[in-house]
């Protein structure tokens, strides 16, 4: 029996000493030159602020955007050229029209029931020694907040309506007429309605925002020749009409309607007093396509980016969202190149010294390998206004 035990132990020892051939090493992913940064880092927040300021300046219509949180950020450091940042920003629409050119700090996000929210992707170039701040490209996608979900939270809150609603146009016309009646000399005309909401108070109520322009005739002119109709808007008004419900009053008494209006006039577009960071505007407003997409024809001129407005998610047809991931609710694409090795972007016009100055631009990164500190903390933590 002892001999048998010894034989078993020797067999086990031999098995333990036997080695299997080593597995082949796994192929290593090449190191990316894009360095992930924390989304709440003070420098990152400053870069995000510069980028969003430039996005707002590039708009000719709509409302200014504010930063809700940094969703993702990568930095590509390029020696004497400085850094190119790849930013994904969650944004909220503010109460400031882009034509007002107000400072970002003076603009406030809208109430939750009228919120417009979304996501922007942007590339932003910084060269601190040369004092260069430049936005080569951006794209944004925005949606209004879900009316169904806001009504669940606040059933009596105002609800956004279509800008072409006849009652909204009537509210704009009547409130502007009231403003003109109090204007000492100039008259103003409606350009277009930019926001519209309705609510039941003591009766139907309509709240509108609209752009105005100077009318070709003043109040003192009985007749005058018409000016060109494409004059620029000079201000924005907020008007409302509230019609009282008087069912308990005899029919001989007319229905009461309350009309309110306030208007704000835009400052000169030539210079914005007190505007921060003038270096952000270095470079032309519109660039040849060769500076924004190296493989395109140099004769084509295109803007640096765009803002896409989509309907609220509840308004989409089932087949439009069927099978889609949550990220597809805010499709934002920003690829100046699809070359994994990158392409060059000529930014010589930003620099005073002679010689070519080129940035290496890589495909915009996805979620892989982003910082564990992203997304960052949000300013408005309402889940109704946070993209996935």
From Swiss-Prot:
The record's Pfam families line, in alphabetical order, gives:
Cystatin
Outline what the protein does.
Protease inhibitor required for egg fertilization. Required to prevent premature zona pellucida hardening before fertilization, probably by inhibiting the protease activity of ASTL, a protease that mediates the cleavage of ZP2 and triggers zona pellucida hardening.
Give glycosylation sites per the record. 40, 139, 292, 295
Q: Which cysteines are joined by disulfide bonds?
A: 96-107, 120-140, 154-157, 217-224, 237-263
Q: Which PANTHER family is this protein grouped with?
A: FETUIN, FETUIN-B
Spell out the Polar residues composition-biased ranges.
279-300
Q: Give the UniProt family note.
A: Belongs to the fetuin family.
InterPro entries noted in UniProt:
Cystatin_dom, Cystatin_Fetuin_B, Cystatin_sf, Kininogen_Fetuin_HRG, Prot_inh_fetuin_CS
Q: Where in the cell?
A: Secreted
Q: Which PROSITE patterns match?
A: CYSTATIN_FETUIN_B, FETUIN_1, FETUIN_2
Tissue distribution: Liver, lung and tongue.
Per UniProt, what is one GO molecular function of this protein?
A: metalloendopeptidase inhibitor activity
**Record-level GO cellular component terms:** extracellular region; extracellular space
Keywords from UniProt, A to Z, are: Disulfide bond, Fertilization, Glycoprotein, Metalloenzyme inhibitor, Metalloprotease inhibitor, Phosphoprotein, Protease inhibitor, Repeat, Secreted, Signal
Signal peptide region: 1-18
Name of this protein: Fetuin-B
Region annotation Disordered: residue ranges?
270-343, 367-388
Knockout phenotype, as recorded, reads: Female infertility due to a block early in fertilization. Oocytes undergo premature zona pellucida hardening.
Residues with Phosphoserine modification:
321
Q: Where is the composition biased (Basic and acidic residues)?
A: 367-381
Question: Per its UniProt entry, which superkingdom is the organism in?
Answer: Eukaryota
